[in-house]
From Swiss-Prot:
Catalytic reactions on record: L-tryptophan + ATP + H2O = D-tryptophan + AMP + diphosphate + H(+)
Region (Condensation): 1325-1477
Family from the record: Belongs to the NRP synthetase family.
Keywords: Isomerase, Phosphopantetheine, Phosphoprotein
GO molecular function: isomerase activity; phosphopantetheine binding
Record GO biological process: amino acid activation for nonribosomal peptide biosynthetic process; conidium formation; pigment biosynthetic process; positive regulation of conidium formation; secondary metabolic process; secondary metabolite biosynthetic process
The protein, known as: Nonribosomal peptide synthetase ivoA
Length: 1704
């Protein structure tokens, strides 16, 4: 084919591009659609934006197009795949698993999700377009482009943009392509119109780049947005009046409410004289009122000036005196402080019309501001000692807010955190920029700011601007709603960048207050490293100049001063023309620039890099602070002669303000050198200075460290030599630091640096133990508010509660620590008893040992070999070992059989003192295996043996201990304590014994108690696979010998490089190297042994997971090891990625690394019963243990060589625990992963096992070296049992395409599903409503419209799109949430007896149905039926109300502001339930005995109020009395001295869980707790009721969702009486009894309702609007006799009447 004709250089951009694309289209089978071809007017304002903003608009419009066209709920991500000098290519990737199942109704324009999953966007810069035509793209890029059916091609230059959409004709029809193009044009046009409305027409700006070198590489500055801030916000209020504008801890406001309140207040402010260029001060704490006040001041025409109530009163008075405001707006809480400031004030409370001056609020003449009037004044620190007020005009902030909002993607769906103090300019951005873009401002309380994660989650914050220091205290998992994080105010450090860059869209922002908050932005998403790169200009122009000559622009990459120009610049400093003139400079060409004082450089692309400051200004936690202002304040003290304040960047004073003083009475002679005379301040002088500076400086400006010098070093000019002082501070060593601040040494109050609170102080304050003063406050020790937040977080992790406000007060750390301990004590487990001189139970792994080993004395030993670096004597070693044994008495334990059960005992007192606890050998041994090869006597022998072997100057120590008393972790403790004892002996010091953690005896005792509380069904989320030991038995052998003398071993290793890659790639929040090794082993096994399923693997762990934070066994010696089974079915092993994800999902779902399972299996009677006879839990085919690094020596153990060898050796005749042992460890010092397979040599398939090991190695190495894309799927909860996957596929359901989520239902749901599988009438909720017209003029009910409305409701709620399947392989039900379902709806029209569309019970129908019947009178009967597995009583009201709204056309406009049900399960379920097949007895049909209402019903609420009990407690009391009468145990008489114990379950709503929006969610949010109480004859009914009410209240609070026990199986309380009974107080869902549509034309009337529960007797009470409407007694026919049930119902009626009469 002929080549295209290339036009000459003068050809227009459109002609060149058209010819190029025409040729490509013919050649490649493409067709083309031009976007917005003839609309120059619309493009013109767009061309005034920066290139950064232009590209962002196009990219966002294309992302929105893909999302809408594919009907996805996910926004596509654009990933750059190619970049050259003048073009780049991006690929839009869409997560297709959320696309709908069924196609749209019009197949002609239907778009397949696969076609839109990957699309290409190509950008060309037109000035290089001809050169690009002959440029070959890399092969992989061309291949990637050709794989996409749709390509958007963009050609641009400074004066013109041209966009074409290309599509493959064999993949898309012209109609389909046209639909995509139409959607894209719509979004692009809306964006261009928004730009046009924000940027009014302006004359073209001359291109002055030629004269300004580095001046703005791509664009002139952004045109001025000549609008008032409040006008832009009012436009949003008109556009979205009902949308939430303010969401605060103390209230919320819609945009309409915000507009109305601010307008009323603005009129009041005018009576105070508010008008343009006048000032209004605001003195308020955080509140929803503050944004109202800010907007009101702007509407009044004045400028607002925020003041901080926490600042010193003298400073506030100084500011008030300077700005002379016409009014001061405050709150009643701060009114006393406001009165002292001497300014007319207005207190804002709920009544806006109340004024202290008694002024009227009549509407006054309009005094609105213009865009050039002042909008606000922010005061920053000043070098003269006087704060300087930055005056910012409306147009400056409007320009900045609009341009930055476009870059950040702010919009109506943005919920922005208002975190910064009001006196920071960032708060202006958080409030006004958010409102300008139609978002919601989320305002925490002052206390919330110290634990901000909780507020961010509850307020559903999506955008935040934090300093890197503040961002460091948060974790991405704590704020799942956060989508955009901006960091600014400080240099973005590497750790903060790496923590967030892959979890949110991360921006680094820069800008002084003088440039309207921010003017440089860098997108750090996905990038690593520190953020010294500030980014590119947004909203203005920036360039680099010579600090001594700003007219000289510096070349690219040269460091100079950063200057800013453009419409975003502030007016200047308030009433300070000299400082304004020096900072805001007019250049020779007339351009006005601001000199930032920041040193920076700019590269050829316009990217700015920060290099520090040229003056004395520093940023502390985002606040600009001028050092000179602090120094001036300190010099006002008479006793200070001179001062230098520094902010060191490294060393012991890193990022702390340090004041270096010379006092008036000090000698200037430096006898000990320049800094030799440095001293700390006495307490009196420190308090005097602190009192003074606290009265004039803000808290952030007060130095945290103070010291004095005989003289301050000076330069020849006479000025202080700051560089020398700073260098001395940064280089100061610990010895000098201690001499200055702790000269007496004895003042140090630390007795134990390992104390948990002390450890927190040391870590957070970054101090050495000798530098921490517990007798001083947190602030006095160098702390600040950010450190206080970090300390609170660290304490919380340690199970300790501390109050941030106390930390920031004057209390000493010692006192705070004592208070914290007392506060936390109520949350700890009951006091743990001390060790006793008596036998105590075994740990689970010890019990397993005695169960499996026929001769326990043969058993296992662990041996450690370490080289001694400094020679020791045997006697010294003996004493050191005796010291270790005295500290860890388990090393001298004895094992005895007591009544057939093995127990253990440790020696006490004299027994310990005189016991020969260890044997020391000195003769040579051949090898480590030869030493101590004889069995150890468990009952009366020695369990610790040591061998000290000398060879010349070298000594080697070998320690051998019976495995029953140690594990791998124990050796780290033993070696450390042994080293310390030897070191103390060499130095002639005594060896102290301290026990900071539990003893092994205490752990075993508490563990046995804990195990008794565990439920076997809840400790293991996935059932093990079938065990198949016979597979390994040779046909000619009766049994395979599995002892340590009959084993063989195969090993392989990964190189150090591969090992490093493994640790880096597979050590994340969700993936562990264990997952990789398990997954690749399973894949290898599947490949080699094709004839059988993959085996269950028991994962071995250290077993030291505490169930409460107060249990610390980190320094305890004993055998703790635990294990749990995991099975990766071969059908789920599709590839390496899915195998790793499956292993990760199953491993992480097991609570506490399997410790609860292990404890339950061996220590719990129920666990022994459930697991004891199940071979899957008893016979271990494979055991896997990843030990990590096996080096045991700590860095400080200088007596020992670095390399420590450790081995586990079994006696030749000892039985092994499993058939195959797979061990993995990182060997040091080579840093290589070593994997070993150990198995009996007599097994079958030995050759294939060798193949297995080889294949395993290959797969493991390949996985390590490949770049597996795990990130996109780690959050995908679509791991589904293989048999369920197969059943879904039979029904045409694809997991990845059609399923939203797969999760394990709660234990309550599992129980309901089991019961329904046997007797389907249980837990089937039915309600019948009549829907009728309210007037004769009303339109008849449209039955088809009602059916369509129900479809909308079903689509809205995930529980209504949930189907349940049973997995036979894993013996549990699973819940599958489908993207699309077709609900079961039956329509029976007038005169027709059969349904138009039959209700179905097919495999893909959720468990609910609707039947609609038309009546002759125009009404409709609606029958709704649900399984209780998907709704509760409150859900019924929600669903019916949604149906009404959908019928009225209002549902589609309501936000989805409620959580899916599985979020509740994850919070409430202590572990994923494993519901075994329940043995349920047939119960028969449910019979209902209705109660006939009497006058007594109306009196129940009054009786309850009078006695301060709830209606629920009233009726539960009545039920208790009836149960006590009917079910008294045989031979038990109830009299005045005895009481009858009764128990019953009751239905408790669990919508108090701390999950935002749960009150609007649909699902079974219920618990079924058991209430056990005593009914005593002779006690009044009133006292019984009050006691039961208190018991219920305590129980509901103590069994909160947070304790993980919320969703356990119902107990049915059958232990105390014959029948299982339930009390169901139906006070939720009553809103669905009678409903009227908003239009008032028709109403719903409940005709009947049934709700059968699987209990022998159910007492159900209906409560509506606080009134009792009736009750019923329901019983299971065939279990309860009718006569007995009837008698119970009659007695219940009598008891209720008697209770009302007695307690009213």
């Amino acid at each position: 084919m002929a080549s295209p004709i290339i036009q000459p250089a003068g050809a227009g951009i459109h002609d060149i591009f058209t010819q190029l694309e025409l040729w490509e289209s013919i050649d490649k089978g493409l067709s083309m659609i031009t976007i917005l071809r003839d609309n120059d007017v619309l493009w013109k304002p767009f061309l005034q934006l920066t290139l950064f903003n232009q590209l962002n608009i196009v990219r966002k419009a294309w992302s929105a197009t893909i999302q809408k066209a594919s009907e996805s709920d996910k926004v596509p991500t654009l990933k750059d795949v190619y970049t050259s000098e003048s073009s780049f290519i991006a690929q839009a990737l869409l997560d297709t698993k959320n696309l709908q199942i069924t196609p749209p109704a019009t197949p002609r324009t239907a778009l397949s999700g696969a076609l839109l999953a990957k699309t290409i966007v190509i950008f060309h810069h037109s000035e290089r377009a001809q050169e690009e035509l002959g440029t070959e793209l890399p092969e992989e890029v061309r291949s990637l482009v050709n794989q996409n059916a749709i390509c958007l091609k963009v050609l641009y230059n400074a004066n013109q943009w041209h966009i074409d959409l290309h599509y493959k004709r064999d993949s898309l029809s012209s109609a389909q392509a046209g639909e995509v193009a139409e959607i894209f044009e719509q979004y692009l046009e809306e964006a261009l119109e928004a730009v046009a409305s924000a940027i009014p027409p302006s004359p073209p700006v001359e291109d002055d780049n030629a004269g300004h070198g580095g001046l703005c590489k791509e664009r002139t500055d952004c045109p001025k947005v000549n609008r008032c801030i409040h006008d832009l916000i009012e436009e949003q209020a008109i556009a979205r009046p009902d949308q939430e504008g303010i969401c605060a801890y103390d209230g919320s406001l819609s945009y309409a409410g915000l507009s109305k309140l601010s307008s009323v207040l603005a009129e009041q402010l005018k009576t105070f004289g508010a008008r343009p260029e006048q000032r209004v001060a605001i003195l308020m704490n955080k509140s929803f009122w503050y944004p109202v006040v800010v907007l009101a001041v702007l509407k009044s025409g004045a400028a607002f000036v925020p003041l901080d109530p926490s600042h010193p009163k003298n400073r506030l008075k100084q500011l008030i005196s300077e700005i002379e405001p016409c009014a001061l707006i405050t709150t009643s809480v701060l009114s006393e402080l406001a009165d002292d400031l001497g300014c007319p004030s207005l207190a804002i409370d709920s009544d806006l019309t109340r004024s202290k001056e008694g002024s009227t609020t009549a509407l006054l003449p309009n005094t609105s501001a213009s865009p050039n009037n002042a909008a606000y004044i922010i005061f920053t620190s000043g070098s003269t000692g006087k704060p300087k007020g930055v005056v910012v005009e409306h147009s400056a902030l409007s320009t900045s807010a609009i341009t930055r909002g476009v870059v950040l993607g702010l919009g109506p769906d943005s919920r922005v955190l208002q975190y910064a103090p009001h006196t920071f300019d960032v708060s202006v951005d958080e409030i006004l920029t958010t409102l300008i873009h139609g978002g919601c401002v989320c305002v925490p309380s002052e206390d919330d700011r110290f634990s901000i994660a909780h507020f961010m989650e509850s307020a559903r914050v999506t955008v935040a601007l934090l300093t890197p220091t503040s961002a460091r205290t948060l974790h991405p998992d704590e704020v799942p709603s956060l989508r955009i994080l901006q960091t600014g105010g400080e240099v973005l450090t590497e750790d903060v960048n790496d923590k967030w860059s892959n979890r949110v869209t991360l921006f680094n922002v820069y800008g002084p207050t003088e440039a309207s908050v921010a003017c440089v932005i860098s997108n750090r998403t996905g990038l690593k490293g520190a953020g010294h790169v500030l980014g590119q200009a947004v909203g203005g122009k920036l360039w680099i100049v010579d600090p001594d000559d700003i007219e000289r622009h510096l070349p690219d990459n040269e460091v100079g001063e950063l200057v800013i120009s453009g419409a975003i610049l502030a007016r200047g400093y308030f009433r300070d023309p000299s400082r304004t003139e020096s900072s805001f400079v007019r250049m020779r060409n007339g351009e006005r620039v601001y000199r930032t004082g920041d040193l920076a450089s700019m590269d050829s692309a316009g990217t700015i890099i920060y290099h520090g400051r040229k003056d004395l200004e520093v940023k502390i936690r985002g606040q600009r602070i001028n050092i000179a202002e602090i120094e001036i304040a300190i010099l006002q003290c008479d006793l200070v002669h001179s001062v230098v304040v520094e902010y060191p960047r490294s060393g012991l004073f890193e990022k702390k303000l340090v004041a270096v003083l010379r006092f008036e009475d000090s000698s200037s002679d430096a006898e000990d050198g320049l800094f030799g005379g440095a001293k700390g301040l006495t307490e009196d002088i420190y308090c005097l200075l602190l009192s003074h500076v606290s009265s004039v400086l803000t808290p952030a400006m007060i130095p945290s460290k103070w010291l004095s010098l005989p003289c301050v070093p000076q330069m020849p000019s006479g000025k202080a030599d700051r560089k020398q002082v700073r260098g001395w501070l940064e280089d100061m060593d610990k010895r000098t630091y201690t001499r200055i601040f702790h000269p007496n040494g004895t003042d140090n109050l630390i007795s134990d640096p390992s104390d948990s609170m002390v450890a927190i102080w040391l870590k957070v304050l970054k101090l050495e133990p000798q530098s921490l003063r517990l007798d001083q406050s947190f602030i006095r020790n160098g702390g600040d508010s950010i450190m206080a937040m970090e300390a609170r977080h660290q304490a919380h992790e340690a199970g300790i509660n501390i109050d941030v406000r106390e930390l920031l007060g004057s209390r000493a750390l010692q006192e705070i620590g004592e208070m914290a301990t007392k506060t936390s004590a109520v949350e700890e487990v009951s006091k743990i008893e001390d060790d006793r001189d008596e036998p105590f139970p075994l740990s689970p792994v010890q019990q397993m040992y005695f169960d499996k080993v026929s001769d326990p004395s043969l058993g296992l030993q662990q041996r450690v070999c370490v080289e001694i670096m400094t020679k020791i004597q045997p006697d010294m070693l003996r004493e050191a070992l005796n010291h270790v044994i005295q500290k860890h008495r388990m090393l001298a334990a004895r094992f005895t059989k007591h009544m057939g059960q093995w127990m253990q005992q440790v020696p006490f007192g004299k027994n310990l003192k005189h016991l020969s606890r260890c044997h020391i050998y000195s003769q040579a041994v051949g090898s480590l295996g030869d030493f101590c090869s004889e069995p150890m006597a468990l009952e009366d022998g020695t369990l610790l043996h040591a061998h000290l072997q000398s060879s010349g100057e070298r000594q080697t120590l070998v320690l051998c201990v019976h495995h029953l008393v140690v594990d791998f972790v124990s050796w780290r403790v033993i070696l450390q304590d042994l080293h310390d004892a030897l070191a103390a002996a060499q130095n002639g010091l005594p060896s102290g014994i301290s026990r900071s953690t539990l003893t092994f005896q205490q752990w075993c005792r508490e563990q046995t108690k804990y195990a008794s509380t565990l439920i076997p069904e809840a400790v293991l989320p996935f059932a093990p696979g079938p065990v198949n030991l016979r597979f390994w038995q040779p046909s000619n052998v009766q049994a395979v010998s599995n002892t340590y003398s009959e084993i063989v071993q195969h090993d392989f290793r990964l190189s150090s490089t591969q090992t490093t890659q493994m640790l880096e790639k597979f050590t994340t929040a969700t993936v562990h190297p264990t997952d990789l090794m398990l997954a690749t082993f399973a894949l290898a096994f599947k490949r080699i042994f094709t004839e059988r399923d993959t085996p269950t693997i028991f994962i071995e762990g250290h077993g030291r997971e505490p169930w409460h934070a107060s249990l610390d066994v980190s320094q305890t010696v004993g055998w703790f090891t635990a294990a749990f089974p995991i099975h990766l079915p071969k059908d789920t092993l599709l590839n390496t990625t899915t195998a790793i994800l499956g292993a990760s999902e199953r491993r992480r779902s097991v609570l506490a690394n399997g410790h609860p399972y292990w404890a339950c299996r061996y220590l719990s009677p129920n666990g022994q019963k459930v697991f004891g006879d199940d071979p899957r839990h008893q016979e271990m085919e494979f055991v896997f243990n990843y030990a990590g690094s096996i080096v045991q020596r700590a860095p400080g153990q200088t007596l020992f060589a670095e390399n420590v060898r450790i081995a586990e050796i079994g006696h030749p005749n000892c039985e092994r625990f499993s058939l195959f042992d797979i061990g993995a460890a990182i060997e040091m010092p080579s840093s290589e992963l070593v994997v070993s397979f150990t198995f009996p040599k007599g097994i079958a398939h030995r050759e294939r096992v060798a193949e297995l090991v080889k294949t395993y190695q290959e797969l493991l190495e390949t996985a390590v070296e490949r770049d597996l894309d795990l990130s996109a799927k780690l959050s995908s909860p679509l791991v589904c049992p293989a048999d369920v996957v197969r059943s879904l596929e039979v029904n045409g359901v694809c997991i990845e395409r059609d399923v939203e989520i797969v999760y394990t239902p709660s234990s309550i749901q599992q129980h309901m599903l089991w019961r329904q599988s046997q007797e389907p009438w249980f837990y089937r909720v039915q309600g019948d409503w009549t829907i009728e017209k309210t007037t004769t003029q009303s339109e008849p009910v449209d039955i088809d419209r009602l059916s369509h409305a129900w479809n909308q409701v079903v689509h809205r709620h995930t529980t209504l799109r949930t189907v349940f399947r049973y997995s036979s392989e894993e013996e549990r039900f699973v819940a599958i949430v489908l993207h699309e379902v077709k609900p079961a709806i039956s329509i029976i029209r007038k005169g027709i007896q059969t349904s138009g569309s039959l209700c179905r019970d097919d495999d893909l129908s959720p468990p609910h149905r609707m039947v609609l019947r038309e009546k002759d009178n125009g009404s409709v009967v609606c029958e709704l039926e649900f399984s209780h597995t998907i709704i509760d009583a409150a859900s019924r009201s929600i669903v019916v109300q949604d149906l009404l709204d959908a019928y009225d056309g209002k549902l589609a406009h309501r936000p989805l502001d409620f959580p899916p049900f599985w979020e509740y399960i994850r919070l409430a379920q202590s572990s994923t339930p494993s519901a075994r097949k329940e043995e349920l007895h047939r119960a028969g049909r449910v019979v209902t005995l209705p109660f006939q209402p009497t006058h007594v019903l109306s009196k129940v609420p009054e009786a309850c109020k009078k006695n301060e009990i709830t209606i629920s407690s009233f009726f539960m009391t009545a039920w208790s009395i009836v149960l006590a009468k009917h079910f008294v145990a045989h031979n038990q008489r109830v009299d005045s001295t005895s009481s009858q114990a009764v128990a019953f379950d009751y239905v408790l709503s669990d919508r108090s869980a701390n999950i935002p929006g749960i009150e609007s969610a649909v699902g079974p949010y219920i618990r079924l707790p058991t209430l056990e109480t005593h009914v005593k004859e002779g006690v009044s009914l009133k006292n019984i009721a009050r006691g039961l009410h208190a018991q219920c209240t305590f129980q509901s609070l103590s069994q909160s969702t947070q304790d993980g026990s919320s969703l356990e199986l119902p107990s049915k309380a059958t232990a105390l009486q014959k029948y299982s009974t339930l009390v169901n107080i139906r006070n939720s869902g009553s809103d669905s009894l009678d409903l009227v549509s908003d239009s008032g034309e028709w109403k719903w009337i409940l005709q009947g309702f049934s709700d059968p529960w699987d209990y022998d007797l159910v007492f159900a009470v209906n409560v509506h609007a606080g009134k009792v409407t009736g009750w019923t007694v329901e019983y299971a026919d065939g279990v309860v006799e009718h006569s007995a049930a009837d008698e119970i119902a009659k007695d219940l009626n009598d008891v209720v009447e008697r209770m009302v009469c007695e307690i009213i």
